[in-house]
Design a protein with these regions (language model features):
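Extracellular glycan-modifying ectodomains
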Residues: 1-270
Length: 270
């Protein structure tokens, strides 16, 4: 999700936990899709698309309930509207079906002020503006878009004590303005720049204790994402057991998903 109104709509849907309904889907002759979801959720059968979308919405609702700190990134103020509603994804539909416009600062602020009074209330919110340029909007169009996002973030941070701004946009475009910090496309940040921004971000929002735990947390998360060449091997079962021991040594961290994965691997391959 790139534009603030689509981000706000997703957060409202998580808070309301209302299921996606068949009437909300579109059909392009091959796939059922939803203007609020990425194309990876589209499917040849409507029930299949609905199942994937509602599973994602349920997961988002659970994450929102559990979160005490939320990081939101505004990517662009340019939006496309279909039948008067802002869409998150155009799904390659004809351009004539959409109206393109730029969100105003007040429009963005109002949407998130309502969220702060509702589902985001009592949570710390960290806002960032994506430093990645949307060149499809032209350099001039990208500049006014980022300006609107930055002004909206500033006003929200001034209005709400639980809202803070992290300057990822300024770090990449001002602090790391040399092109050696950009990838080959000269738009996205290079790995060195990503690591630099991450160091600044973690120092700003994480406690010293949390930063000390990061290597251990990353080790376990990466291990759970690893797909072994021979999952049935005794070596991999022992690998999973060691990861479960490491998880047990960090009871303050929510590793439920990773622990379930390692336990399942041991059971299936025993």
């Amino acid at each position: 999700l790139f534009n603030p109104l689509s981000i706000a709509a997703a957060l409202r849907s998580y808070a309301g936990e209302s299921p996606v309904r068949h009437s909300e889907l579109g059909f392009d002759g091959e796939l059922w899709f939803h203007y609020g979801f990425h194309g990876s959720f589209s499917a040849p059968e409507a029930d299949q698309a609905l199942a994937a979308m509602n599973a994602a919405r349920k997961s988002g609702a659970e994450a929102l309930r559990a979160a005490d700190r939320i990081v939101l990134t505004f990517g662009t103020a340019w939006v496309y509207e279909h039948d008067g509603a802002v869409v998150a994804n155009c799904h390659r539909r004809p351009a004539a079906e959409f109206t393109r416009r730029r969100l105003g600062v007040d429009e963005i602020v109002t949407a998130f002020a309502d969220l702060m009074a509702g589902p985001l209330g009592g949570r710390e919110v960290i806002l960032t503006v994506s430093p990645v340029r949307h060149l499809g909007d032209s350099l001039a169009g990208n500049a006014v878009s980022k300006a609107a996002l930055r002004l909206a973030a500033e006003e929200l941070a001034e209005r709400f004590p639980d809202v803070h701004y992290f300057p990822a946009y300024e770090i990449l475009n001002d602090d790391l303005r040399d092109y050696r910090f950009y990838a080959d496309d000269l738009v996205h940040p290079a790995p060195q720049a990503v690591e630099y921004v991450w160091e600044k971000f973690s120092a700003a929002v994480l406690s010293e204790q949390a930063r000390r735990l990061l290597p251990d947390v990353r080790h376990i998360v990466v291990a759970a994402a690893h797909r072994p060449r021979i999952p049935q091997s005794a070596t991999y079962r022992e690998f999973c057991r060691r990861r479960l021991e490491e998880i047990a040594a960090l009871p303050q961290i929510d590793f439920r998903t990773e622990a379930e994965y390692f336990r399942r691997c041991i059971e299936i391959n025993s």
